[in-house]
Structures are given as structure tokens and as C-alpha cells.
């Protein structure tokens, strides 16, 4: 969101709009331009509408349609090599508990963008950071939650990501779903926290983590191989640090 203020009397109003845009829905940067002639305007304080000031941030949490949640559950149950890829939307939505519960309940390997790290500890048995390329390339289902499909995730494009994988995506911004750079098999417009909560309820008893044992084992083997290779000391926990 970007706007220019020409009338100093509208500063409180437009500042409120900018704050709402920055903090609600899908948070992001905003820009307000105040030209010099606006800054030096002399206005009567009584002519300023202060009613827009101090309004609470609108924090809507749209749920996912139940039929789409059911479709995602069915796709996960059918998948043999699923991957969960999440971003900062998990943090903004405060959905870390729901994500942790989903990973624990299903045993699906997960990866985060740099902006979304830490929502689930990286020493979790379903986290294989050094095997990231293998996971993305070999996955038969990729569930993306709360992240743009930009250069950070290579736009989810082959060959870095499997060309044949089923793509499911949850995002609070309808434009992210409608304008996805990769065709979505399941595109859900919903708040991450609410949608993952719905998914956790719907998935109960329908997925056995053991069905992905072979997938996790393959990634664990690749992880161990990467850690043992050249440069493996960069992953060492040894104390003191080798100079």
C-alpha cells in the first residue's frame, strides 16, 4: 500500500488506513508520502477529524471451506512422499502450536523459509534441513502454508521442485492463491492458524505416521550423508569452536 497525502487534515485518517493495511490480513510494508507543501500547511485543529485515530487493528481470521480441508486430508492420506513448506505467515498468525501438532500427528517432513524458522525446532525428527533439495525434488505432495511463492522458494518451479507433485497451498491473501506462479491442485484462502487447526481435527485417525517411515528414512540417510561430507564441520556442535 502506498499513498500521498495532499491535505494535512487527512493525516490521521490516512495514517490509520496505512496501519490497518500493514498489520491486518497479510501484514506487509506500507508507504505514506507527505510532500513538503503538505507538511507546512497550517490548518485549524478543529477541522481535523480525529475519530479515525486509535482504531483497533482488524484481525480477521477466515476459516477454510470444510470441503477443501477434506480434499487436503484425502491427498495427504494418498501421498507417499509429502512435504510441508511454511513461511512467516505461521508466525504472523501465531500458528506454531497448530503446525507443531500437525507435524507430530502425521510425521510429515517439514521445511521453513528463512523468515519462518523456529516455529518447530529444527532438531525435530521430521526436520531434515541438509536434505532439502532431495525432499523438494522427490516429493509427491507439497503443502505450502503462509509463504509467497517467490525467489526464496524458487517459485516452486521444476527442476528444484518436483514437476509431478500435487501442490496444496493455504494463504490468507486471495491474490496469492489466484495469482500463484505454479498451478495449484488445492488452493485454500484462509488464516494459517485457523486452517491448520481445522486440518488437525479433520486428520485425526486418518493418517498413520508409519506410512511415511520409508520417506523419512530416505531423507534421514541423505541428511547423514550431507553432514558427513566436505564442510561437515560447519554443522558441528563441538566446543570450543574449531578456529
Predicted regions and their residues:
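Glycine-rich, acidic loop regions that bind phosphate or pyrophosphate groups
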Residues: 1-14, 113-218
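Active-site diphosphate/adenylate-binding microenvironment
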Residues: 218-243
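Anionic-ligand anchoring segments at beta-strand to alpha-helix junctions in alpha/beta enzyme folds, i.e.
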Residues: 64-65, 71, 76-142
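Conformationally flexible catalytic loops at phosphate/diphosphate-handling active centers
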Residues: 17, 21-78, 224-228
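Glycine-rich beta-alpha junction loops
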Residues: 34-40, 88-90, 174
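Active-site glycine- and acidic-residue-rich loops that bind
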Residues: 12-13, 88-94, 238-240
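Short, flexible loop segments at the rims of nucleotide/cofactor-binding pockets, characterized by
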Residues: 8, 58-64, 88, 119-127, ...
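Generic secondary-structure signature for well-ordered alpha-helical cores
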Residues: 1-7, 16, 20-28, 44, ...
Amino acid at each position: 500500500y502506498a499513498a500521498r497525502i495532499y491535505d494535512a487534515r487527512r493525516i490521521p485518517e490516512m495514517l490509520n488506513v496505512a496501519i490497518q493495511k500493514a498489520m491486518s490480513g497479510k501484514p506487509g510494508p506500507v508507504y505514506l508520502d507527505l510532500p513538503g507543501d503538505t507538511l507546512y500547511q497550517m490548518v485549524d485543529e478543529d477541522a481535523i477529524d480525529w475519530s479515525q485515530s486509535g482504531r483497533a487493528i482488524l484481525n480477521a481470521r477466515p476459516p477454510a471451506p470444510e470441503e477443501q480441508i477434506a480434499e487436503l486430508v484425502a491427498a495427504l492420506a494418498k501421498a507417499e512422499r509429502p512435504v510441508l513448506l511454511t513461511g512467516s505467515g505461521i508466525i504472523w498468525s501465531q500458528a506454531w502450536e497448530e503446525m507443531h501438532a500437525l507435524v507430530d500427528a502425521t510425521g510429515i517432513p517439514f521445511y521453513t523459509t528463512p523468515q519462518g524458522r523456529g516455529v518447530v525446532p529444527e532438531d525435530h525428527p521430521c526436520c531434515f534441513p541438509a536434505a532439502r533439495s532431495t525432499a523438494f525434488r522427490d516429493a509427491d505432495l507439497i503443502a505450502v502454508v503462509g509463504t509467497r511463492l517467490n525467489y526464496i522458494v524458487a517459485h516452486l518451479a521444476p527442476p528444484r521442485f518436483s514437476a509431478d507433485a500435487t501442490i496444496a497451498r493455504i494463504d490468507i491473501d486471495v491474490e496469492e492463491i489466484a495469482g500463484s506462479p505454479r498451478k495449484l491442485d488445492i488452493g485454500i484462502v484462509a488464516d494459517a492458524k485457523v486452517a491448520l487447526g481445522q486440518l488437525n481435527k479433520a486428520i485425526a485417525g486418518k493418517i498413520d505416521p508409519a506410512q511415511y517411515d520409508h520417506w523419512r528414512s530416505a531423507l534421514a540417510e541423505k541428511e547423514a550423508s550431507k553432514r558427513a561430507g566436505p564442510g561437515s564441520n560447519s554443522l558441528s556442535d563441538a566446543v570450543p569452536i574449531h578456529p
